[in-house]
Amino acid sequence: MAEQVLPQALYLSNMRKAVKIRERTPEDIFKPTNGIIHHFKTMHRYTLEMFRTCQFCPQFREIIHKALIDKNIQASLESQKKLNWCREVRKLVALKTNGDGNCLMHATSQYMWGVQDTDLVLRKALFSTLKETDTRNFKFRWQLESLKSQEFVETGLCYDTRNWNDEWDNLIKMASTDTPMARSGLQYNSLEEIHIFVLCNILRRPIIVISDKMLRSLESGSNFAPLKVGGIYLPLHWPAQECYRYPIVLGYDSHHFVPLVTLKDSGPEIRAVPLVNRDRGRFEDLKVHFLTDPENEMKEKLLKEYLMVIEIPVQGWDHGTTHLINAAKLDEANLPKEINLVDDYFELVQHEYKKWQENSEQGRSEMHAQNPMESSLPQLSLMDVKCETPNCPFFMSVNTQPLCHECSERRQKNQNKLPKLNSKPGPEGLPGMALGASRGEAYEPLAWNPEEPTGGPHSAPPTAPSPFLFSETTAMKCRSPGCPFTLNVQHNGFCERCHNARQLHASHAADHTRHLDPGKCQACLQDVTRTFNGICSTCFKRTTAEASSSLSTSLPPSCHQRSKSDPSQLVRSPSPHSCHRAGNDAPAGCLSQAARTPGDRTGTSKCRKAGCMYFGTPENKGFCTLCFIEYRENKHLVAASGKASPTASRFQNTIPCLGRECGTLGSTMFEGYCQKCFIEAQNQRFHEAKRTEEQLRSSQRRDVPRTTQSTSRPKCARASCKNILACRSEELCMECQHPNPRMGPGAHRGEPAPEDPPKQRCWAPACDHFGNAKCNGYCNECFQFKQMYG
């Protein structure tokens, strides 16, 4: 079995590399003779990262986790909201370490190199530092920390010099490797906070310990005593320029240390660890250990010097609030290939996975041969991809892909009935047309009906999402546009804040399950600025491209087949009802994007269309002017589609939008632009007009003297002509001296000619239309736009 074949530690995958690491580690320690602390030269800069496991099936993934991950500590820290509580940063996993009393060194060594400190290299370096170097600074910091502790403050305990020296000598003995009589029956004595502080100075690298604040009972969960080990340990005995600023992250629970490592290529989250705890309705900074009083006043500065501190947004406790918290950036995997044990373990896992798959397939085939009527454990054949049936909550299987077991059985039943129904020759017996359907109603593709009873789910239960949904590759941002938070699969792809906001808005509607958002495509559920019969331009282009193949099979074109490999679509729950219908049976809500009533927007005067920045009016049914034009256009098309053929509802002679880098379709109603680009162009035109309005007025003022001066010049003698004479000696202008030959025979020079003054361009910049006096020099369109939005 794979459980027995997979090694229980990383170093067991390649013993040669493990030996090479153990040889290099002691050689890298530098021990000065002038009293300076012992320290590593280069090997303290390495960092381990775990490989991805989402490509394996859930059963084999569980085998990997059982071999390498300490599930008890991980679950304990996560349940206490100390680990992985922030969705904006990458998830950390706890690797197993030996519980022999040297777990602090095991965890630190494994975080950097992938091997445990079985040779006691780190423990010997710690002991030699405490014995052979100047430790007065360490002792002074330890005394300050002890005096501030709860034992001294609450009990009023006072130590004299002899007591302090005895306690310090005891701490040095605890770090020794020669401990035949260790406490608690362990091979080595457990270490304390001061040992972590000395260790981070030996490594010249910060250490962050994630731990609970209280020691709790394993049975009742009651508090025993406060825990002080959690917090930040900075290498304060070194200048920040000589330290490695990426911290080592350890977890501590039940008197045991484990390394907390990130997963390689795990998703879009930030590779960082929060420097705060979320507890009791507030964010509390992690404690920075062993600071002197002057250093405590400049704690923020020290953190930014020794760590790469960044700010990340997190959701506040109150609804709609956002907080910026500090987080320390984590290092990525940088082990050289000759000492990288993760790559070797991953190759071994891939090899064992192939063997495990072959054994599983062979076992299923033998079981099916013994009892053909019995299904061969369909749960073991589940894949991490949703069933292709619209709105089906189950996952597809290896044997029934691209459908789940339920939909596959229903399709087989329907196919068995089709030959009987379609036995008639001629048009009535076309495949894909169901007899007994209403006129013009085509055969509907298989869709999930939540009301249909099933005899027990052979697939994954809909109330328990697949572990794949929580894996590292599905970590995506919230579906709400502009929201910086990470989604929660339990909230239908939204973060907690946006989900609560949607719940509040949905409570005002009587039947929100049938409520369609005109700002969303009904096929791919994406937020769009313009829809065509309820679908976005991308899905519309796809349906028109598939029109020929759809007509050949007499099936209605499906709106949009979602990609099976797109993880963002896996976490989005489809609409409770299907919109894939055709003909007269199509509900108006699925074809139109304007099914809302003004009562749904009570308390606000914003436009009814989602994402529109303008305000609506009661005359336009709650829409702004532009959205109301689009609403009337789509409503007219919906009314006409009921009388036309199924293919008549498609738009003909569509043109792409004239906007730059815009892939949507344009509309003649918006001068060839889509609605979004039209609004942007009008806004730009309006701002340019507003910006240059003063310049235009000043130019008009300058033109006034010129016109008054020109009026003093002699005009044409003809009463109907207002032209200015080119020469003072003449009585008629050049136009009257040479009449237009195209004048009709009934016209003569004595008749007054119609006035046709020269036209003037619109005052708005970049406008090709002509202005008029009624609109103050603007064209009708720009003047109306200026009246509406100016």
Swiss-Prot record:
<feature type="binding site">
    <location>
        <position position="779"/>
    </location>
    <ligand>
        <name>Zn(2+) 7</name>
    </ligand>
</feature>
<feature type="modified residue" description="Phosphoserine">
    <location>
        <position position="459"/>
    </location>
</feature>
<keyword id="KW-0238">DNA-binding</keyword>
<feature type="site" description="Cleavage; by MALT1">
    <location>
        <begin position="439"/>
        <end position="440"/>
    </location>
</feature>
<dbReference type="GO" id="GO:0045824">
    <property type="term" value="P:negative regulation of innate immune response"/>
</dbReference>
<feature type="binding site">
    <location>
        <position position="662"/>
    </location>
    <ligand>
        <name>Zn(2+) 5</name>
    </ligand>
</feature>
<dbReference type="GO" id="GO:0004843">
    <property type="term" value="F:cysteine-type deubiquitinase activity"/>
</dbReference>
<feature type="binding site">
    <location>
        <position position="677"/>
    </location>
    <ligand>
        <name>Zn(2+) 5</name>
    </ligand>
</feature>
<dbReference type="GO" id="GO:0003677">
    <property type="term" value="F:DNA binding"/>
</dbReference>
<feature type="compositionally biased region" description="Basic and acidic residues">
    <location>
        <begin position="689"/>
        <end position="705"/>
    </location>
</feature>
<dbReference type="GO" id="GO:0006915">
    <property type="term" value="P:apoptotic process"/>
</dbReference>
<dbReference type="GO" id="GO:0008270">
    <property type="term" value="F:zinc ion binding"/>
</dbReference>
<feature type="active site">
    <location>
        <position position="100"/>
    </location>
</feature>
<keyword id="KW-0677">Repeat</keyword>
<dbReference type="GO" id="GO:0005634">
    <property type="term" value="C:nucleus"/>
</dbReference>
<feature type="binding site">
    <location>
        <position position="607"/>
    </location>
    <ligand>
        <name>Zn(2+) 4</name>
    </ligand>
</feature>
<feature type="binding site">
    <location>
        <position position="627"/>
    </location>
    <ligand>
        <name>Zn(2+) 4</name>
    </ligand>
</feature>
<feature type="region of interest" description="Disordered">
    <location>
        <begin position="550"/>
        <end position="580"/>
    </location>
</feature>
<feature type="region of interest" description="Interaction with ubiquitin">
    <location>
        <begin position="190"/>
        <end position="192"/>
    </location>
</feature>
<feature type="region of interest" description="Interaction with TNIP1">
    <location>
        <begin position="369"/>
        <end position="775"/>
    </location>
</feature>
<keyword id="KW-0007">Acetylation</keyword>
<dbReference type="GO" id="GO:0070536">
    <property type="term" value="P:protein K63-linked deubiquitination"/>
</dbReference>
<dbReference type="GO" id="GO:0007010">
    <property type="term" value="P:cytoskeleton organization"/>
</dbReference>
<feature type="zinc finger region" description="A20-type 4">
    <location>
        <begin position="601"/>
        <end position="636"/>
    </location>
</feature>
<feature type="binding site">
    <location>
        <position position="407"/>
    </location>
    <ligand>
        <name>Zn(2+) 1</name>
    </ligand>
</feature>
<feature type="modified residue" description="Phosphoserine">
    <location>
        <position position="575"/>
    </location>
</feature>
<keyword id="KW-0378">Hydrolase</keyword>
<dbReference type="InterPro" id="IPR051346">
    <property type="entry name" value="OTU_Deubiquitinase"/>
</dbReference>
<feature type="modified residue" description="Phosphoserine">
    <location>
        <position position="645"/>
    </location>
</feature>
<feature type="active site" description="Nucleophile">
    <location>
        <position position="103"/>
    </location>
</feature>
<feature type="active site" description="Proton acceptor">
    <location>
        <position position="256"/>
    </location>
</feature>
<dbReference type="GO" id="GO:0035523">
    <property type="term" value="P:protein K29-linked deubiquitination"/>
</dbReference>
<feature type="binding site">
    <location>
        <position position="624"/>
    </location>
    <ligand>
        <name>Zn(2+) 4</name>
    </ligand>
</feature>
<keyword id="KW-0833">Ubl conjugation pathway</keyword>
<feature type="modified residue" description="N-acetylalanine">
    <location>
        <position position="2"/>
    </location>
</feature>
<comment type="function">
    <text>Ubiquitin-editing enzyme that contains both ubiquitin ligase and deubiquitinase activities. Involved in immune and inflammatory responses signaled by cytokines, such as TNF-alpha and IL-1 beta, or pathogens via Toll-like receptors (TLRs) through terminating NF-kappa-B activity. Essential component of a ubiquitin-editing protein complex, comprising also RNF11, ITCH and TAX1BP1, that ensures the transient nature of inflammatory signaling pathways.</text>
</comment>
<dbReference type="InterPro" id="IPR003323">
    <property type="entry name" value="OTU_dom"/>
</dbReference>
<comment type="similarity">
    <text>Belongs to the peptidase C64 family.</text>
</comment>
<dbReference type="GO" id="GO:0071947">
    <property type="term" value="P:protein deubiquitination involved in ubiquitin-dependent protein catabolic process"/>
</dbReference>
<feature type="binding site">
    <location>
        <position position="498"/>
    </location>
    <ligand>
        <name>Zn(2+) 2</name>
    </ligand>
</feature>
<comment type="subunit">
    <text>Homodimer. Interacts with TNIP1, TAX1BP1 and TRAF2. Interacts with RNF11, ITCH and TAX1BP1 only after TNF stimulation; these interaction are transient and they are lost after 1 hour of stimulation with TNF. Interacts with YWHAZ and YWHAH. Interacts with IKBKG; the interaction is induced by TNF stimulation and by polyubiquitin. Interacts with RIPK1. Interacts with UBE2N; the interaction requires TAX1BP1. Interacts with TRAF6.</text>
</comment>
<feature type="compositionally biased region" description="Polar residues">
    <location>
        <begin position="566"/>
        <end position="576"/>
    </location>
</feature>
